[in-house]
């Protein structure tokens, strides 16, 4: 697909990671005929810089305390705690999978809210994230709308006109604003 775009547009893509201008890792290819586009300068924005101070059901996961990045995925887990994804006799359970990471960046936002959550739980797989079977929901939280906006470098409150679900989906589908602004800043200005 990359080669089709390159051949059709007649320009080579530039790989830019939004982590240089925001608190998320988001590697993307940009095709542009704007000359001399370079990598943006690293602003050193970390996840703690964009998180809201919020209180919620699980107070261990608030700003200022160690939070781990995680994702919630459906898995078929046998009685020994091992994955058996092809064994259709085992029910799918939503697992909180805490990533081993030494970065202070969010993973790439998507249109699926459970792809990125925050938790105080340690690295590993934690079964029954939503407490469907054991009755106790695991301690995690989703990013807020404001945090989504900040991860994509939108102004605070930019999506307030939409309901939260639609806003998060639109933001997850969008571009990182400051990356686009950086690319456009290289347009040559000619005095006429």
Summary of predicted features, one role per range:
Residues 164-168, 180-181, 185:
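Catalytic phosphate/metal-binding cores of nucleic-acid and nucleotide-processing enzymes, i.e., regions
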Residues 3, 51, 149-152, 181:
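Generic structural signal for individual residues within well-ordered alpha-helical segments
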Residues 1-114, 119-132, 139-141:
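Class I S-adenosyl-L-methionine
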Residues 96, 129-162:
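FAD-binding beta-loop-beta segment adjacent to the flavin cofactor pocket
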Residues 140, 168-169:
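Residue-level signal for helical boundary/lining positions with a hydrophobic bias
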Residues 8, 182-190:
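C-terminal alpha-helix
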Residues 176:
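A helicase ATPase "motif cassette" and its flanking acidic/Ser/Thr-rich regulatory loops
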